[in-house]
Amino acid sequence: MLKKGERGDGMDKLAVLRQYFGFPAFRAGQQTLIDAVLSGRDALGVMPTGGGKSLCYELPALLLPGMTLVVSPLISLMKDQVMALRNAGIPAGCINSSMSLDELRETYRDARYGAYKLLYVAPERLLTDGFCSLAQELEIPLVAVDEAHCISQWGQDFRPSYLKIVEFLQRLPRRPAVAAFTATATAQVRADIIRILQLHEPETVVTGFDRPNLRFDVLRPKDKRTALLQLLSERRDKSGIVYCATRKTVEQVCGLLQEAGFAATRYHAGLDADERKENQEAFICDRSPVMAATNAFGMGIDKSNVSYVIHYNMPKSVEAYYQEAGRAGRDGSPADCILLYSSGDVTTAKFLIFNSSAENEELTDEERQMVQAQDLARLEAMTGYCKTQDCLRGYLLDYFGQPHEKTCGNCGNCLAEYETRDLTREAQMILSCVVRARNRLGYCVGASILSQTLHGGRSARVRELGLDLLPTYGLMSALPGAQIREWIELLERAGYLETDPVHGGIDTTERAAAVLFSDEQVLARVQRTTLAGPRTQKKAAASRTDEPLLAALKALRFRIAQEQGVPAYIVFSNATLLDMAAKRPGSMQELLEVSGVGHVKAERYGAAFLNEIRHYTHTHREES
């Protein structure tokens, strides 16, 4: 264990990597960024969630003199990171608004005495007199900026407090190296990070956005509640997050899950701080393995054993979706990212977009219009993800500008079975209804009203608009409304219809005339079946993992975590337990060959896990 005030002198990068982090080699991009930081250069790392960004400043901190300062946006996030570092034998501390005056004084004192190799701080704290005075006394060779996309107004999570970082750096006696890290940054956001942080010719590494261990799927269930219960029933022994668009939906979903017997909890901004903290800790420590939450439960999650993320509603942007879905599988284990889509999600998202910009009093009318247009463009891209029949992984990578194979072979769309059907008659009915509704009203209506009209629904709105008087009223009464909406979306994908991005009205394109008046055939690629649950994943090669042994190791991990009052993943990650179950180490030396087992953790937990493996092996041998 590294003692207070010590540094890893005499150790090379690989020795530190092995001893403190338990990994035999660096991942893509890590060594380049670490070398740049150790040489005093600025750096920008764009790596997917779970790609090892934090190691790029944690490891150099052990080899550099003095103390590395880490700017982190959320209290819960920095607390989890500090807990994990201390558990690995690395002295780390944090300063945030949740600490008492005595705790702050103790942390300031320890920092002055060289007790920490890493100190985490919220950006709001940087320019306070007390912290500035402390920082000016310390040797700070490196400032790491986590979640650096928060500094860009083009990013999906802009935080004005991040703009204070540059002024803080200017107040230091000597400018340290600055390293910025993010998981979701387009080229425009990356340029903003470099410009605003004033990075000097930074070593820039973009390892890509692909997360091969994540399996993406978009489902269109008739009943989201039934589909959600089915999905969670198939994952009862796993931990996961269910993201919802509104606080009301969080309450409804959490209640639904609890009534069905799931140990679920909730998180949204409407809860008081104490309840949010209590619920988050219950989730982190696996007392409540299912969390229903709004996006307020975002960057504060550093839980590595999340096996699935389900979006009950569609998010407002691809950036937000990829960041939230990326909470799954952070330890590299296979994980599911499933989105339950309905056309009503688009309406909800637009309401949230217009409402949030209208409530922002800091914006001028011109700025408000610009923000709304930008958000609507993002929403259109997100809607495209939900409607595409192409590879879902490819769609996401396209959005972030990363080359990829045409198909991944492992997302819901790649695994689905399709057939070509002649939908000319259905297309003519829908296109005719669009034209007749527009001619009657003088404007275009949305997919919901169109589908109700074609189905023959007696809703008050249809009658109020007089659409029940159209010749196309009830033409598709034999089909459920959800099926009609699917055909409408299919015609939009095929270029026969287009949706107004602001008002949501649907109109015909020039291509529609050929179908209506020239009998152009409409051949569509449609799924053979519409599934309420996830599509069956292709069977991988036989796993080397012994599932009963893995279950025994997880049970031991849980008992140790409960005894020590720490989250289970702090003891060992799921990926480490998978490797342990596959390798079945019989000695301490063999245990150190397991990925994620460093010397400190081997010394702390090794005997218990080796005993569990020996007991299992002995029992299994007797039974066989």
What are the language-model segments listed below?
Residues R7-Y20, P24-A28, T32-S54, L62-L64, ...:
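Helicase motor core with emphasis on the C-terminal RecA-like subdomain
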Residues L2-V16, T347-T348, E359-T364, Q374-L376, ...:
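Accessory DNA-binding and partner-docking regions appended to nucleic-acid-acting proteins
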Residues M370-F400:
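Short, charged low-complexity linear segments at domain edges
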